[in-house]
Amino acid sequence: MDIPNPPTSKCITYWKRKVKSEYMRLRQLKRLQANMGAKALYVANFAKVQEKTQILNEEWKKLRVQPVQLMKPVSGHPFLKKCTIESIFPGFASQHMLMRSLNTVALVPIMYSWSPLQQNFMVEDETVLCNIPYMGDEVKEEDETFIEELINNYDGKVHGEEEMIPGSVLISDAVFLELVDALNQYSDEDEEGHNDTSDGKQDDSKEDLPVTRKRKRHAIEGSKKSSKKQFPNDMIFSAIASMFPENGVPDDMKERYRELTEMSDPNALPPQCTPNIDGPNAKSVQREQSLHSFHTLFCRRCFKYDCFLHPFHATPNVYKRKNKEIKIEPEPCGTDCFLLLEGAKEYAMLHNPRSKCSGRRRRRHHVVNASCSNTSASAVAETKEGDSDRDTGNDWASSSSEANSRCQTPTKQKASPAPPQLCVVEAPSEPVEWTGAEESLFRVFHGTYFNNFCSIARLLGTKTCKQVFQFAVKESLILKLPTDELMNPSQKKKRKHRLWAAHCRKIQLKKDNSSTQVYNYQPCDHPDRPCDSTCPCIMTQNFCEKFCQCNPDCQNRFPGCRCKTQCNTKQCPCYLAVRECDPDLCLTCGASEHWDCKVVSCKNCSIQRGLKKHLLLAPSDVAGWGTFIKESVQKNEFISEYCGELISQDEADRRGKVYDKYMSSFLFNLNNDFVVDATRKGNKIRFANHSVNPNCYAKVVMVNGDHRIGIFAKRAIQAGEELFFDYRYSQADALKYVGIERETDVL
């Protein structure tokens, strides 16, 4: 095997020179194409304007111009000036009018465009500067280094100018492809010249072949070369990487070129894609594969698809609901019910999750068939399993279905001690064909309804419950039930809940005394071990919420409240912990009542229900625009939520440098991880101005696992008053940004 010689310095210099020349040519070509495109658009728009103008001129020529009767000037007004109006038409006489001056109208305050929002919207960090903001000639002359510092904050990355800025090292995908293809032509020419010299002897030795055979052979070789495009030489990527090192190493560039040039079949499915369950190509897949899109796109915290508030989705809860909805009816549902099989009623009594059968009753209803004697040693033990959302498809393999053809009980490879299992005897029947969609749907339904085959059959609609039962036996899912320990977790609430209020107070006082830092909540996911010092909730001094995967008896879980009043004092554990009452935890205060969202006894659930006041937008007496309230509110009453874009602290620092130059900022710290920016997106409360004597105050509240900013009344506010709250500026910033302080008429 021939080992390629390493490239010489002369070769490297040659390729670098080619890279530089081709890159400059492509840059010039891009500029020329941009200029030509702008000229073409200008010519097209100018032609459209000329066409419209010509049509209007033709219409004006068809109209008849009638002279206006002269108005006699009114005498006796010595202070009014007299104006003369002369017409351009020769047939019209001049007109004389008295001039009446209008009073000066106050200008409307400047307002920048913004999009209305009703809740926070999380966005990604902008690592590329979208545009260079115009600050005016004054800022440009006084602070010449501002634009340079702004570009440096984005590492010199400006949108749309990767290839145009001199000295830029970023190459877009389009220019990268064109550059590699252009350099590849030089590589092909070199190889062709080398092949011509090396293959000369072979061609001379085959001159005795007929002319027709030689032409045919050359035609076949030419077609092969044209059909298969040669991958660029490694020297090309090495030369580009040496000229533009910030774009990556040669291996990265090679992989980038391969991804950009791969031809994808438009009809081909992604590698990890399940065919549509309602389509003709539906396949029989496991439950986790059928629900993959559901678990990926559905947010378990917001209960909606494509959630734009949480960057990640919590894993499905491994614990079942308290109000169990699984029940096997003791009576058959029809003539084809599986309960009509011999021993099926005993099976229903034994495997009903709601029934509390004693061991004596289990032994009395136990039925053993002679055909089961050989397989009794490999009986299935009920394993401790949670919600089937976390089960893997390997547990549902039907590898043991052949061994269970005689005895209708599933088995596993490893035997475990368990009570003797029930065997159901049935009459031989014809095999029923199941489609891939039906099998997949059955596995999805079985994770919710378990052994309630009558309900599963009604949901399928194409199979009887007897056929569903037979398929379940074949799938080895007959005993795949959650244990009573997980279905009915031990509840020790009476004494435990009284201790929780003191526990919450201790934790809250500890948080208040130690630090004022608030961290974003992320659900913990360690179901096999308790919450200790390594738990993310404890590390960030957050409570474990209902979205966490820890045990329900976790000492760090927040239990909610059992208040009977309005939950607006520190006697309420939720109010003390600066959080709203959770409708899933607080069942006695009224937070869980959803009959009327406005008439509710609990006063600590206003943000999650959106019980905001009617706000008005008008010019402010202090600065710019202001927010006014249309209805009167009482002290500590919820007014509105401060909504905007959720951005990181680093992104807030980059945006804040621009906002400081504009002397207008809508940034609001949410916690140590995120900031709410209402500059581009927000609601009307964003126009509330700053004051050292405000009538409102802002408070960050935990609402169902999310930090949200609520604006509350600091005192009783009358209808029509302008809303102010303290921005908590420093003394220097307050004098810099707030020039006028409002008059405190109302004490």
From Swiss-Prot:
Gene3D superfamilies named among the record's database cross-references: SET domain
Enzyme class of the recorded protein, top EC level: transferase
Cross-link (Glycyl lysine isopeptide (Lys-Gly) (interchain with G-Cter in SUMO2)): K327
Compartments (UniProt record): Nucleus
Keyword Nucleus belongs to the record: yes
CXC domain: residues covered: 504-606
EC number of this enzyme: 2.1.1.356
Reactions it catalyzes: L-lysyl(27)-[histone H3] + 3 S-adenosyl-L-methionine = N(6),N(6),N(6)-trimethyl-L-lysyl(27)-[histone H3] + 3 S-adenosyl-L-homocysteine + 3 H(+)
SUPFAM superfamilies listed in its UniProt record: SET domain (SSF82199)
Biased composition (Basic and acidic residues): 194-211, 382-393
GO annotations of cellular component type: ESC/E(Z) complex; nucleus
Domain SET: 613-728
Keyword terms, alphabetized: Chromatin regulator, Isopeptide bond, Methyltransferase, Nucleus, Repressor, S-adenosyl-L-methionine, Transcription, Transcription regulation, Transferase, Ubl conjugation
MF term (GO), any: histone H3K27 methyltransferase activity
Annotated function: Polycomb group (PcG) protein. Catalytic subunit of the PRC2/EED-EZH1 complex, which methylates 'Lys-27' of histone H3, leading to transcriptional repression of the affected target gene. Able to mono-, di- and trimethylate 'Lys-27' of histone H3 to form H3K27me1, H3K27me2 and H3K27me3, respectively. Required for embryonic stem cell derivation and self-renewal, suggesting that it is involved in safeguarding embryonic stem cell identity.
Subunit structure: Component of the PRC2/EED-EZH1 complex, which includes EED, EZH1, SUZ12, RBBP4 and AEBP2. The PRC2/EED-EZH1 is less abundant than the PRC2/EED-EZH2 complex, has weak methyltransferase activity and compacts chromatin in the absence of the methyltransferase cofactor S-adenosyl-L-methionine (SAM). Interacts with EZHIP; the interaction blocks EZH1 methyltransferase activity.
Name of the protein in question: Histone-lysine N-methyltransferase EZH1
Organism: Bos taurus (Bovine)
Gene name of the record: EZH1
